[in-house]
Amino acid sequence: MTGTPPPSRFPEQPIPPWRRAVLKVGSSLLAAAGGGLSPRFALDLAHFVSANITAGRQLVIVSSGAVAAGRALIPPLPESGGALAARQALAALGQAQLIALWQRFFDRPVAQVLLTHDDLRNRRRYLNARATLRELLHLGTLPVVNENDTVSVDELKLGDNDNLAAIVAALIDAQALFIATDIDGLYTTDPRHHPDAQPLHEVRTLTPEHLAMAGDSSSTVGTGGMRTKLEAALKAGAAGIDTYLFNGRSSDVVRGLAQHRLRGTRIHPTCTPIAARKYWLRHAPVEPGAILIDAGAAAALAQQGASLLPGGVLSAEGDFRRGDMIQIATRSPDHPPHPLARGLVQYSAADVRRIAGCHSRDIQPLLGYTYGDTIVHRDDLVLL
């Protein structure tokens, strides 16, 4: 569905407050007619990002466009992009151009983050990616994420950056996913062929019927259509994240977003972010082994919602690795270990044994490296 009916067909609606969000920008909004990249639509989107950062919010951009940028630097390839190796070469050539496009709009550092889905499926790499993005946001930089198309074979597929944007939104505990498209939002049918197509300004629950409405259309420069955007909304919704589809080619629409007004489609999540994360933490498979903690640490976790620090750790059982889901248990002289919580551990069992009972500032001297002050962060922990 790629028609562009008047924006007024989508009624204006308020956007609930959010603290952290992901903005996904597709190739069709960045590609220049004669090849390469154009700042035409990116400028309005940059104003949206800048206004929210100035207001104290945090944003990550997931941006396509590297392959489109690369095409302008070498002789033309067939419309399909040629062999996989050629597309990967185009991505390598164009990635620097893509980051340069975004950097020109901001007076703060823009950080390039290249990810594959393997980075986010592997628990240890997942933790590393999340820690990096959080630190970049903490430092006040603007992370710009893209698929690592140069080395990823399976990742060069339809709509991958749409899905990546949803995964990144969950990764950083975002409250909103904004997907900039070249159409106004979701319709009951393809408005290019059906003038009576009705706009859907709000979707409470995505259904197979909605996916069927979207079809599988895509632009000539990108690799995704409306269907993949709805699939991304499903992923985001399962993590408790609102998704907003809007026309990134409309200056009025983008300016409205900066004032928390949407003319487009809002897709509601299926649960709250906290409920989604806690459900996953509670039900994800647990690796063999456990961390045994003292009464003080147990009270801090149970009564104060604190993170697990090394000072309250007595010992570690088993051979778990960084990123594993492990059990946290209390131990006292008169009672056997009692399960208290479970969570994603930042250090391996061997490391936990070495730093058990020490102050967080001693982690670096003892191990020679550090993954942070906590053994299990409170965001990665759920009480039993």
Swiss-Prot record:
Query: Which top EC class is given?
Result: transferase
Q: Which SMART domains match?
A: PUA
Signal peptide, first to last residue: none
Q: Which CDD domains match?
A: AAK_G5K_ProB (cd04242), PUA_G5K (cd21157)
Which amino acids does the record list as binding substrate?
Answer: 64, 149, 161
> What reaction gets catalysed by this protein?
L-glutamate + ATP = L-glutamyl 5-phosphate + ADP
Which Pfam families does the record associate with it?
AA_kinase, PUA
Family classification: Belongs to the glutamate 5-kinase family.
Name of the molecule in the record = Glutamate 5-kinase
* Organism encoding this protein: Xylella fastidiosa (strain 9a5c)
